[in-house]
Amino acid sequence: MKVETCVYSGYKIHPGHGKRLVRTDGKVQIFLSGKALKGAKLRRNPRDIRWTVLYRIKNKKGTHGQEQVTRKKTKKSVQVVNRAVAGLSLDAILAKRNQTEDFRRQQREQAAKIAKDANKAVRAAKAAANKEKKASQPKTQQKTAKNVKTAAPRVGGKR
């Protein structure tokens, strides 16, 4: 025996009961009663309707309120494990974590300086290559543009 759940009220629906609504996107919604179906069609939020399960959970009514309280009490304890990660030893990780801001800033500046120097060297090499290219190529004469006759402008409109 397959017991469904109402998408609106949250109550169980036994075989032979309930109404099915097939939406245009192909999803099937099962409602406990016409009352639940009407509430859904009127776009009423089930959390605000007093007889739905969602309302009872939200406002901690009856057995639903007791379930929530017992759930909150149980918490899983998290174990902290110190170990090497991604090819770094534990000592290396701790050393990185304990670095001062000044040391990190100096490292950043040094890395930026090295990158800038490398860029300057590449630019200088390109500039030298361009100068050699220009010197080896003979200057070509510029071609003059031909005057192309265009149609006279149309005065007035189409009609």
Swiss-Prot record:
Signal peptide annotation: none
UniProt-annotated stretches for the region Disordered: 118-159
Coiled-coil intervals: none
InterPro entries linked to this entry: L24e/L24_sf (IPR038630), Ribosomal_eL24 (IPR056366), Ribosomal_eL24-rel_N (IPR000988)
Gene3D superfamilies, A to Z: 6.10.250.1270, Ribosomal protein L24e
GO CC list: cytosolic large ribosomal subunit
SUPFAM superfamilies, sorted: Glucocorticoid receptor-like (DNA-binding domain)
Domain of life of the native organism: Eukaryota
Composition bias, Polar residues: 137-147
A GO MF label: mRNA binding
GO biological process, one term: cytoplasmic translation
Keywords assigned: Ribonucleoprotein, Ribosomal protein
Similarity remark: Belongs to the eukaryotic ribosomal protein eL24 family.
Protein name: Large ribosomal subunit protein eL24
Primary gene name: rpl-24
